[in-house]
Amino acid sequence: MNPLISASSVVAAGLAIGLAAIGPGIGQGTAAGYAVEGIARQPEAEGKIRGALLLSFAFMESLTIYGLVVALVLLFANPFS
């Protein structure tokens, strides 16, 4: 395999997982902050808020998992070699 392609794949894999984690990380922090604020305002709605928060966390985390899959494909099943 060409060393340039191998090195580029490693850099691309690092960027894929790094950039895929930034957005969901910021989104999860913001969502958790607003959920805590909502629970503080209406403690009786805690169950509904928590359920919606956990569901949204799952959707946000799936974006990071997609980035991980792309990184693993670039590392182990390199389509460019």
UniProtKB/Swiss-Prot annotation:
Keywords: ATP synthesis, CF(0), Chloroplast, Hydrogen ion transport, Ion transport, Lipid-binding, Membrane, Plastid, Thylakoid, Transmembrane, Transmembrane helix, Transport. GO terms for cellular component: chloroplast thylakoid membrane; proton-transporting ATP synthase complex; proton-transporting two-sector ATPase complex, proton-transporting domain. The record marks E61 as: Reversibly protonated during proton transport. It comes from the Eukaryota. InterPro entries: ATP_synth_csu_bac/chlpt, ATP_synth_F0_csu, ATP_synth_F0_csu_DDCD_BS, ATP_synth_F0_csu_sf, ATPase_proteolipid_c-like_dom, F/V-ATP_Csub_sf. The keyword Plastid applies. Disulfide bonds: none annotated. Gene3D superfamilies: F1F0 ATP synthase subunit C. The chain crosses the membrane at residues 7-27, 57-77. The keyword Chloroplast applies. It is a multi-pass membrane protein. It is found in: Plastid, Chloroplast thylakoid membrane. It holds the Pfam family ATP-synt_C. Belongs to the ATPase C chain family. NCBIfam families: ATP_synt_c, PRK07354.1. F(1)F(0) ATP synthase produces ATP from ADP in the presence of a proton or sodium gradient. F-type ATPases consist of two structural domains, F(1) containing the extramembraneous catalytic core and F(0) containing the membrane proton channel, linked together by a central stalk and a peripheral stalk. During catalysis, ATP synthesis in the catalytic domain of F(1) is coupled via a rotary mechanism of the central stalk subunits to proton translocation. In plastids the F-type ATPase is also known as CF(1)CF(0). F-type ATPases have 2 components, F(1) - the catalytic core - and F(0) - the membrane proton channel. F(1) has five subunits: alpha(3), beta(3), gamma(1), delta(1), epsilon(1). F(0) has four main subunits: a(1), b(1), b'(1) and c(10-14). The alpha and beta chains form an alternating ring which encloses part of the gamma chain. F(1) is attached to F(0) by a central stalk formed by the gamma and epsilon chains, while a peripheral stalk is formed by the delta, b and b' chains. This is ATP synthase subunit c, chloroplastic. It comes from Bigelowiella natans.
